[in-house]
């Protein structure tokens, strides 16, 4: 389920960096759209406008290609009964997603896909409710029973009906604006400490480095938002599939996560500085026990 967030953020960083590089090169060649003053300083308002344009173009471009990127990077095989014959299990998966989608009020059915992976995972993505994708791992279908699968699918459909990807795109656009603005200022400061003939190349390299670093730091804001929205998707999933199935799905995920943690405990411990704080900051999902507790109290 974290795949959706990580794919979106990775795509955003790549798109944002590419747009920034292209615009910077064009600006240096043509002089159009530059935020530098005649004396080599920075015009804050011009830089802010530049940052807003780059930031939101980057986030909405990431949203527009999110479904294609997910299929490409995860190797998702779309299940289309009109084009290919499906196995009984595959047809059942498509029927479940479509049934839940109709119950949620969607008028255009999401694409449904499977990707090969032993992990127990699923995600929903896409630029709009009418152009969405629900994908599940082969490991999820192999290790979860029908009730748990139903809960997971309902959770992912709830993400689509809640419009979480669009809201996240707006948030990412704001984060991107700060990233672009601060990275340009930091790069400009760095270029002031070298010889004048080296300043342009230092500014360019520093800009790329600072933009990537600030993008990673900015992703913490997106992660925090994602954790908040998971509770809403859990409630939406409970409304669609039933509270018992949603809780059962989360308990199954918890059981799976516990087995993985036990298998990898030694390796994980050697990398920890403060495991609890680190995982809470960089996690896209809240603690499973807390999610179960909130659903039980619903």
UniProtKB/Swiss-Prot annotation:
Membrane topology: Multi-pass membrane protein
Main location: membrane
Cofactor annotation comment: Binds 1 zinc ion per subunit.
Cofactor: Zn(2+)
One of the record's GO cellular component terms: plasma membrane
Cellular localization per UniProt: Cell membrane
E.C. numbers: 3.4.24.-
Active site: 156
Transmembrane segments: 5-25, 45-65, 170-190, 204-224
Gene Ontology biological process terms from the UniProt entry: proteolysis
Catalytic class of the enzyme: hydrolase
Single GO term (MF): metalloendopeptidase activity
CDD domains tied to this protein: M48B_HtpX_like (cd07335)
Keyword Transmembrane in record: yes
Binding-site list for Zn(2+): 155, 159, 230
Pfam families recorded: Peptidase_M48
PANTHER family per record: PROTEASE HTPX (PTHR43221:SF1)
Family label: Belongs to the peptidase M48B family.
Designated name of the protein: Protease HtpX homolog
Species the sequence originates in: Bacillus subtilis (strain 168)
Underlying gene: htpX
């Amino acid at each position: 389920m974290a795949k959706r967030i990580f794919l979106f953020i990775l795509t955003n960083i790549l798109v944002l960096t590419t747009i920034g590089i292209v615009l910077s090169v064009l600006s240096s060649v043509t002089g159009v759209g530059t935020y530098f003053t005649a004396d080599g300083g920075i015009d804050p308002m011009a830089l802010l406008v530049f940052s807003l344009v780059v930031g939101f173009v980057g986030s909405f471009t990431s949203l527009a290609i999110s479904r294609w990127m997910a299929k490409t990077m995860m190797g998702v095989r779309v299940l289309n009964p009109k084009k290919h014959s499906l196995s009984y299990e595959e047809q059942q998966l498509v029927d479940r997603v479509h049934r839940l989608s109709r119950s949620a009020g969607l008028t255009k059915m999401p694409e449904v896909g499977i990707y090969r992976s032993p992990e127990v995972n699923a995600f929903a993505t896409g630029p709009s409710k009418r152009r969405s994708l629900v994908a599940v791992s082969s490991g999820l279908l192999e290790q979860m029973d029908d009730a748990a699968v139903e809960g997971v699918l309902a959770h992912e459909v709830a993400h689509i009906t809640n419009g979480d990807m669009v809201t996240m795109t707006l948030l990412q656009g704001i984060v991107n604006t700060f990233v672009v603005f601060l990275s340009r200022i930091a790069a400009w400061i760095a270029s002031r400490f070298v010889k004048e003939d080296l300043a342009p190349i230092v500014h360019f390299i520093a800009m790329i480095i600072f933009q990537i670093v600030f993008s990673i730091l900015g992703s913490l804001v997106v992660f925090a938002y994602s954790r908040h929205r998971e509770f809403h998707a859990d409630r939406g999933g409970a409304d669609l599939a039933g509270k018992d199935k949603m809780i059962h799905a989360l308990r199954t995920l918890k059981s799976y996560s516990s087995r993985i943690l036990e298998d990898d405990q030694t390796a994980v411990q050697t990398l920890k500085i403060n495991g609890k704080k680190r995982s809470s900051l960089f996690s896209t999902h809240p603690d499973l026990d807390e999610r179960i507790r909130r659903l039980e109290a619903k």
